[in-house]
A protein has these predicted regions:
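Conserved, structured core segments of small domains
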Residues: 1-98
Length: 98
């Protein structure tokens, strides 16, 4: 199955006064993302250190449409706390993900 790199950023409902884990709906978002990781849909993911309020995901999906449909189910996506900025198909040439 192909890999994709997804860059997400804060959405219009992001509260600048709160940390990431204090955002509204954090617990539901975290449970959702952990389930995707358990299913191996999310291969790797986390915040980008020097790009405030952005995160990168490496996803294992059959195509971009399926990927977008699945990410749209994220509670943070549904409520506007998070939004997808960029999606790139990714080919691994060095190393391997196991």
């Amino acid at each position: 199955m192909p890999y994709f790199v997804v860059i997400n950023e804060q959405g219009p409902a992001w509260d600048e006064k709160r940390s990431m884990r204090d955002q509204r709906g954090w617990d539901e978002h975290a449970v959702f993302m952990e389930a995707l990781a358990d299913e191996h849909f999310v291969v790797l993911g986390g915040p980008l250190k020097y790009l405030e309020h952005r995160a990168m995901l490496v996803l294992n999906a059959p195509n971009e449409v399926a990927l977008q449909k699945r990410l749209a189910e994220d509670p943070w996506m549904r409520t506007g706390v998070l939004r997808t900025l960029e999606i790139y198909p990714w080919e691994i040439l060095l190393g391997k993900l196991t």
